[in-house]
Every structure is written in structure tokens, then in C-alpha cells.
From Swiss-Prot:
The gene is UGT1A5. Belongs to the UDP-glycosyltransferase family. This is UDP-glucuronosyltransferase 1A5. UGT1A5 isoform is part of the UGT1A complex locus which displays alternative use of promoters, first exons and terminal exons. The locus is defined by 13 first exons, which are alternatively spliced to 3 other common exons and 2 alternative terminal exons 5. From the 27 possible mRNA isoforms, 9 produce functionally active polypeptides (UGT1A1, 1A3, 1A4, 1A5, 1A6, 1A7, 1A8, 1A9 and 1A10) called isoforms 1 (i1). Use of an alternative exon 5 (5b) as terminal exon is leading to 9 additional alternatively spliced products termed isoforms i2 and which lack transferase activity. It catalyses: glucuronate acceptor + UDP-alpha-D-glucuronate = acceptor beta-D-glucuronoside + UDP + H(+); zolasartan + UDP-alpha-D-glucuronate = zolarsartan-1-N-beta-D-glucuronide + UDP. The keyword Cell membrane does not apply. The chain crosses the membrane at residues 492-508. It comes from Homo sapiens. InterPro entries: UDP-glycosyltransferase, UDP_glucos_trans, UDP_glycos_trans_CS.
Length: 534
């Protein structure tokens, strides 16, 4: 009889997987990081910190003019000059954020948004041209012999650069407009139950919603072409051959999606798609004495955390006063990240701060609710820590995120332009006092955390995997090599249809010939019979 410790097979497998995920099996490598600024950068930097800790050389390549990407001790920052200044960039960004709160006519608002987006697209494309034509920098990047390019493909310049340098790429993203993530992975994307980005549809759609789901990408096709086509033209110029946008995004060896099926709806995936939703929840830290004091002073009622994200610094006075009025009518202490003008009616229970440790505050047991713009980072921090939400989506996929969480019973959504002080007050009291919201978000939190490998470890593993194997061609589906009609088997269907029609035609002709023969023979017999009777 065997003696000793008997470890059940599932626990043993999980333990080995966890051990593999934390051991630095890859030799020290060189990682070129081309990030997208803003909130996209904030989660990527956690992966860079871990890659550096595991002995890899990390180089971040970005514009001289940016929001958050500054020198840190776990990467080397390389910047390149562009033809516009920090002041010009800041003015453009301010115009973008101010447009969130405009209440003008829909067509005027749409026109203004399109103008802002067009200006931003032109600036980003111009900076890409300046990067790729910076011969000294490109020579330096070639000479450094990087093992992998880690980038967010929200802007396509890094995809062009990775292909130009012939370096395997790992994409780190939430999503890409125009369904380029589906096209780049050749992932099935049926419109019958997979809601399109920006539609706010769920996965259970009515007939009219499915019509909207099918038509929406068609309506955006012109805008998508206008934004992405310049990068295809730039790549075609560099490679001296025709290169499409899909060719650029298909270069990625592995796609690291900042999502999972707790927040997102179930859908098909491909072998090189890895889900790392909640990666920004890693590395929680103790609160400073300042924030601990705020929480201790809140008493039994606890606190509410309020942040509309890193891009919103100023709210119109009338709207800010309506918000302040609602916050003053709840017993909780409210920590509001706000750098704009202090509302004149701000109540004693509301504390304005220029910055707050959002994830760490949400992880405190005295936090009762989270007022958020429903960006993916904030939503995941809410899920990780089990805090119900009042959501005020402003732009982009925030409307979709809010719809998902509201559908799952984890929060309440308000239209920030139309809501009144009473609406916000009622929403806060609902998510704080109605236990179902807390129960639902705790259920989502439990599902999200029940996994063998943490998202950060998973992301680092796949970056190292691509470095070790110089890509991941074995995960690339053959669908990339098919034409559109081969992918949908239209040539096979056409061939089989032609065979069926040919067989049917020959059968018909044979039957017709036989019928005529039989009919002709009967006619001759009848004539012969008549002639005999006469």
C-alpha cells in the first residue's frame, strides 16, 4: 500500500499551472512597448512592471507630447519629436472632454464630435508618419534586436511598425473600433447574438435590435475607412506592395483582451485570443493615512467613491452643482476626484480630491458604492472588489459597459446630460440600500476570481511565450489565407449547386427523351391498328 500525501489530480494540475505561471522560464529578452496614452496605458504599465521584475529589458516608445507616459524605474523611455506642442495637445484634449457635457442639437453635437475626432486622427497619423520616417530612430530600433512588440492597436501605427521591423507582436487591448479585432483574429462574429461595439445591445436582441446590430457597422464603414485607410497607404508605401488594414492587424501573434465572460457576453474565440480582464486590479496597496482618516470619520455609514475617469477634469457649473446637491443628501462620506471649480453648494460630507487610489478605496470594506463613467478599468475594479455602481457613461464603449452591468443587476445607469439631482440621489440610495445590487456584484466578483491563473501572470506568460518561440504561428488559423468567398465556401456551394442543377437537367432531358420515345411508339401502334381495321 502506498503511503504519503495523496493530492487530488485537479488540485495538482492547478498547482503546477500556477507554478509555471510564476517561474521565469524565459531568458532575459527585449520588449519594445508602443502604448496608447490615457487609461489604456494605466493597465499596460502593470504588465511592464512584472516583465521588468522577471529580468526583461523593457523600452517604451512614445511621443514627446503625451498625458501620462513618464519615465519610471522599471522601463526605459524613448521619445520622438513631433510637429505639435503640449499646449496644442492639451487644448485638443480639453475640447474633447468638454464635448461630453454639451447639450446642443444632436446634429450640431455630432458635427462637433466628428471635427474633434478628425483633428485627433490627423495628428496621430501625422505623428506616425514622422516616426516611421525618422531614419535614425528606425535604425536604432532595428539594431536593438527586440524580441517582441507589445502594443495597444487602438491606433494602428504600432502595427505598421511591428510589421516593418519584422518583430512578433502581442496586442494588448480592450477592443478596436470597426470590428478590426474580429477581422484580425478571423474570429466568427455573427450579428444575431454578438452585440456590435457602441450599439448598447445585449446578447438577447429583439428583431429591431438585430436589424440595428447588422446595419450599424455599415453606417460606420465610411468613418472606419477614413480613419484606418491612411495607415494601410503608409504601410503600402513602406513595403512597396499593397497592404490592407486587415493585413496589419493580422500580424499579431497573440491578442491579450482586457475582458472576460463575467463582464462581457459569451462568444466564440480563437486560439490566439487570451482574456486578461481585471489585470488592473492587481497589486493593491494599503491606504495612506489621509484616506484612512476619511474612512474612519465616516462612521457606520461608510464612503462612496466618485470618479469620472482620468480625462474629465471640469464639469459645467450647473451640472456640478446638481451633482453636489445629490451627494449632500446621503449619509455616506463621498470622496470625489475632481480638479475643476469647487461647487458653491458642496456639502460637508463631500470631499474633493485631485487624485484618489481608486482600486484600494474600492477594496475597503466600508465602501458602499462607486459613481463611475463605466470605463472598463473602473468597472473591473468594482467587480474585483464587489462594489455596486451608479454609472454615468460619457463616450466610447462606456455605454456598452454600463448596459452590461445594468443587465447583470450590478448597478444603475444615468444619462449624465439629462439626469437631475433627484435622479442621482435615488440611484445612490437604491444601490446602497437595495441588497440585490450588492449580492449581484458579489456574485460577479466570485465568478471573476475563480480561476487558476491571475490575469497579470497570464499576460506576462504569453508575452514570454511569444519571445521564446519567436511568434505563435501554430495558433494562426488558416482562415487568414482564404479569400472571402472561400471562407464562406461560396465556391463549394456554387460547385455543388452546379452539379445538382446539371444532374437535374440531364435527368430531366433523359426523362423527356424517354417520354417522347414512349409516346411516339404508342402513336405508331395506334396508327397501325387503325389501318388494319379499315
Amino acid at each position: 500500500m502506498a503511503t504519503g500525501l495523496q493530492v487530488p489530480l485537479p488540485q495538482l494540475a492547478t498547482g503546477l499551472l500556477l507554478l509555471l505561471s510564476v517561474q521565469p522560464w524565459a531568458e532575459s529578452g527585449k520588449v519594445l512597448v508602443v502604448p496608447t496614452d490615457g487609461s489604456h496605458w494605466l493597465s499596460m504599465r502593470e504588465a511592464l512592471r512584472d516583465l521588468h521584475a522577471r529580468g526583461h529589458q523593457v523600452v517604451v516608445l512614445t511621443l514627446e507630447v503625451n498625458m501620462y507616459i513618464k519615465e519610471e524605474n522599471f522601463f526605459t523611455l524613448t521619445t520622438y519629436a513631433i510637429s505639435w506642442t503640449q499646449d496644442e495637445f492639451d487644448r485638443l484634449l480639453l475640447g474633447h472632454t468638454q464635448s461630453f457635457f454639451e447639450t446642443e442639437h444632436l446634429l450640431m453635437k455630432f458635427s462637433r464630435r466628428m471635427a474633434i475626432m478628425n483633428n485627433m486622427s490627423l495628428i496621430i497619423h501625422r505623428s506616425c508618419v514622422e516616426l516611421l520616417h525618422n531614419e535614425a530612430l528606425i535604425r536604432h530600433l532595428h539594431a536593438t534586436s527586440f524580441d517582441v512588440v507589445l502594443t495597444d492597436p487602438f491606433h494602428l501605427c504600432a502595427a505598421v511598425l511591428a510589421k516593418y521591423l519584422s518583430i512578433p507582436a502581442v496586442f494588448f487591448l480592450r477592443n478596436i473600433p470597426c470590428d478590426l479585432d474580429f477581422k484580425g483574429t478571423q474570429c466568427p462574429n455573427p450579428s444575431s447574438y454578438i452585440p456590435r461595439l457602441l450599439t448598447t445591445n445585449s446578447d438577447h436582441m429583439t428583431f429591431l435590435q438585430r436589424v440595428k446590430n447588422m446595419l450599424y457597422p455599415l453606417a460606420l464603414s465610411y468613418l472606419c475607412h477614413a480613419v484606418s485607410a491612411p495607415y494601410a497607404s503608409l504601410a503600402s508605401e513602406l513595403f512597396q506592395r499593397e497592404v490592407s488594414v486587415v493585413d496589419l492587424v493580422s500580424h499579431a501573434s497573440v491578442w491579450l483582451f482586457r475582458g472576460d465572460f463575467v463582464m462581457d457576453y459569451p462568444r466564440p474565440i480563437m486560439p490566439n485570443m487570451v482574456f486578461i480582464g481585471g489585470i488592473n486590479c492587481a497589486n493593491g496597496k494599503p491606504l495612506s493615512q489621509e484616506f484612512e482618516a476619511y474612512i474612519n470619520a465616516s462612521g457606520e455609514h461608510g464612503i462612496v467613491v466618485f470618479s469620472l475617469g482620468s480625462m474629465v477634469s471640469e464639469i459645467p457649473e450647473k451640472k456640478a452643482m446638481a451633482i453636489a446637491d445629490a451627494l449632500g443628501k446621503i449619509p455616506q462620506t463621498v470622496l470625489w476626484r475632481y480638479t475643476g471649480t469647487r461647487p458653491s453648494n458642496l456639502a460637508n460630507n463631500t470631499i474633493l480630491v485631485k487624485w484618489l487610489p481608486q482600486n484600494d478605496l474600492l477594496g475597503h470594506p466600508m465602501t458602499r458604492a462607486f459613481i463611475t463613467h463605466a470605463g472598463s478599468h473602473g468597472v473591473y475594479e468594482s467587480i474585483c472588489n464587489g462594489v455596486p455602481m451608479v454609472m454615468m457613461p460619457l463616450f466610447g464603449d462606456q455605454m456598452d459597459n454600463a448596459k452590461r452591468m445594468e443587465t447583470k443587476g450590478a448597478g444603475v445607469t444615468l444619462n449624465v446630460l439629462e439626469m437631475t439631482s433627484e435622479d442621482l440621489e435615488n440611484a445612490l440610495k437604491a444601490v446602497i440600500n437595495d441588497k440585490s445590487y450588492k449580492e449581484n456584484i458579489m456574485r460577479l466578483s466570485s465568478l471573476h476570481k475563480d480561476r487558476p491563473v491571475e490575469p497579470l501572470d497570464l499576460a506576462v506568460f504569453w508575452v514570454e511565450f511569444v519571445m521564446r518561440h519567436k511568434g505563435a504561428p501554430h495558433l494562426r488559423p488558416a482562415a487568414h489565407d482564404l479569400t472571402w468567398y472561400q471562407y464562406h465556401s461560396l465556391d463549394v456551394i456554387g460547385f455543388l449547386l452546379a452539379v445538382v442543377l446539371t444532374v437535374a437537367f440531364i435527368t430531366f432531358k433523359c426523362c423527356a427523351y424517354g417520354y417522347r420515345k414512349c409516346l411516339g411508339k404508342k402513336g405508331r401502334v395506334k396508327k397501325a391498328h387503325k389501318s388494319k381495321t379499315h
